[in-house]
Swiss-Prot record:
It comes from the Bacteria. It comes from Ruegeria sp. (strain TM1040). Keywords: Ribonucleoprotein, Ribosomal protein, RNA-binding, rRNA-binding. This protein binds to 23S rRNA in the presence of protein L20. This is Large ribosomal subunit protein bL21. Part of the 50S ribosomal subunit. Contacts protein L20. Pfam families: HHH_5, Ribosomal_L21p. The lineage of its organism: Bacteria, Pseudomonadati, Pseudomonadota, Alphaproteobacteria, Rhodobacterales.
Amino acid sequence: MFAVLKTGGKQYKVQAGDMLRVEKLAADAGETVQFNDVLMIGGDAPVVGAPFVSGAAVQAEVVEQIKGDKVIKFVKRRRKHSSKRTVGHRQKLTLVKITEILASGADASGVKAATGKGEAAPAAKAAPKAKAAAPAAAGSDDLTQLTGVGPAAAKKLEAAGLTTFAQIAALSEDDIAGIDAIKIKPEWVEQAKELAQG
């Protein structure tokens, strides 16, 4: 039984017991990872995905984090410009050993999904948006409605503790002089009074 999996923008045909060098994964040596992007499973009853085979996965054990062979990039400018530059690059790779090919039941396996080092989990991306939406729903006003207040100035006003039009409308000249984070213009106070009323 073999499988064709996709990782790091490349496709690999693998069997149980194969050693494979793939683009760097976010896993330490000895961990077991699971490749969920399986394009095909071959054997007695081959299954081809569209584009992936649902429920299929390939599990592998991380052997070590390695670097590939050095690639030399040489730049030479010909004719009158006698300059040249040499740069070497060693790609970061992960050496894995294929342990098992699952034709189904990959969701319930409980093994960590193989992700690249630079990728972030989708749940981690959604969390900051939820935190950013929470202060807006907590009774604060959209301060960018004031003339001359953009997103950066609104953040400075919030940092100074001014989140509503009523708070800005209630500021006296002494209060305005005491705020160092941002210079509050008198017309903002007038506009805030109008917006606070309705």
